[in-house]
């Protein structure tokens, strides 16, 4: 489980594909791997991945973290588009006592969104995203959504998708500042919204 509060950005050092598995190696500042064990969960661009190896670099400023990503994950997320030098959002899983500053995020990506518009304003950035039609009903005005793992509040919603308003803090901490028109972003809809809508629809269908 995660909070949707991005801790830092990591840099992709290597991407290799072998027998349906993508080996992803990222470099991250050493404090973010403190007491990190093999098998631990880390959200990379909001996608929950399992740590398979950790290697500290010679200068001890950074560490390499290894993940194996399966085909199903690559098909549902934007991780397959990563390349050397890409920046990814990084969040370690919740531990006892962690402040829940965003909303509860599972790390299970539902779909990807395409960036349709980017409007840069004086103190923020507006971004319009489109998502597959079947997921649109779970994105509600002023509701929560996780974008590349970042817990954000939904702005206006229309037939074309929905808008985000990105404040300077979000732009500074996450990789959304580097997003461009046509890029795809990982989407996890709010689990409570998802459950309520599905429950109501199921009930109404049984009554019909």
Where do the language-model regions lie?
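Conserved loop->alpha-helix
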Residues: 1-208
